[in-house]
Amino acid sequence: SFDDEFKMDNEKQFAKITASSEYTKIESQSGNGHIMYKEITDGDTGETPYFTDQVSVLYTGWFKRYWTQDDTFIGDDGNLFKNKVIFDSTADRNNVPSKFTVGSELIDGFSTALQHMEVGDKWEIWIPWQLGYGASGRGDIKGYSTLVFEIELLEIVK
């Protein structure tokens, strides 16, 4: 079925990232799996948020409908198909940072990353569906979607 293929495609992509030496693994505290990250900028501040802290972040989240295809491609119908979907981004809100409580307002994978980041860090993180929106999905995000975020941790809000 389409869903099975979609699930397999997403799991295969995450496995590919997991096997890549460019990325580092972090186990989720929930025990439901791991995320992968690549450091883009090293904040080097030594300040890491706790589960209960509120943080200020800039981020962009995206996924692909078909991981084997380019970000955009010409479909069988001859039309341009937008394959890479940005589903949420502070860039679309005038780069106003978002504030979240690390442990209670975020999907598991995002929360896991934040607890290992230092203020000033900018990471690319890959989240498997188990630590994202699960089998049911949310809004534009279908169930079993592997998610990618670029996150910049600006501050721990006191």
Language-model features, listed with the residues they occupy:
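Cross-family detector of peptidyl-prolyl cis-trans isomerase
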Residues: 1-158
